[in-house]
Amino acid sequence: MRRGLSSGITLVELLAALAVLGIVLTVAYSAMVSGLRVQTDQEAITTSQAKLRRVVEVITQDLRSAVFGSITNQPFTSNDRQISFALIAGGAGYQVLPHDSGNNHSFRTANNVQIIATVANAAELDLAGRQAMLVNANRQAVIFNVGNVTQRGGPGSVEWSLVHDGCNNTIDYTPNTLLFRIESLGLRYDAATQTLYQRSGASEVPLAFDISGFRLDYVYEGTDGTTEIRSSPYLSPAGQPVRQFTRPDGVVLQLVRLQVSISAAAPSQGRVIERSFTGQVELLTGNKSFGIDEVVPCN
């Protein structure tokens, strides 16, 4: 009588099956780890991109609100790592009156301004102790701190006198000279701490942390159709940023937009993933008869 065939498996077959199983598990594990790594990387990238986009949106929104797109050197000197500009802090521009003498020299050297405002009292103006910007039709502006505000001509008068000690009007009076209540705003990047700061008045607060790179570019367009990108704005003889600059070859350049480039590094699976984001903002130019080409320092 013959012995029946064994229904079991041999040791070799068992080892082969285990080897195949090990290979399958290894492939599956590798695929799972790879998938998790891709997912983690994607989450880090998405988080970084969203963060950078929000920061750029905040910056560009502020820049769009700059008074006639004016770039200044208060509180920071404007360059590729920091920028200053003026925001309208409320109300429309107030009409400025000429001085009684009608002499521009007396207006330039005076430390007071008379305006027309249909308000019941000085408190409604909310100018005392605030910053103001004087803008003339020559496209010049000056910023000063308002001291006291008094009514001229008695009760019911719409004329008000603003005194700003320690700073003259500096610019000429022209028809259609206006005064705005403003707030000087500055942005500053500290590469050592990788922090972007925002300063308003004497207060400086962090705007964004863990920023690995930050750069500002000033985009000028020429009357000859050329575009020039600079790491700092053109300056006037007084050292102030100007919207319009005439090159030695006669080409007139106009500052039309700012480009903001920002980057951040995010940790992922023991590695660092760096992402960048760039945004541009068009600067308001006013119109042909009124705008700001230069914010001059008061003297």
Place the predicted regions along the sequence by residue.
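Residue-level detector of secondary-structure boundary/capping sites
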Residues: 50, 120-123, 272
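Small/polar beta-strand repeat architecture
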Residues: 148-209
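Flexible, membrane-facing loop/turn or short amphipathic-helix motifs
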Residues: 96-98, 171-175, 268-271
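Autoprocessing Asn-cyclization modules and mimics
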Residues: 74-170
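Short linear sequence signals and composition-biased patches located at protein termini or domain-edge surfaces
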Residues: 46-47, 60, 73-76, 88-91, ...
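Aliphatic-rich helix starts adjacent to a transmembrane/signal segment
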Residues: 7-60, 64, 297
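N-terminal secretory signal peptides that target proteins for export/translocation
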Residues: 1-3
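Short, well-structured beta-strand/strand-turn elements
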Residues: 64-73
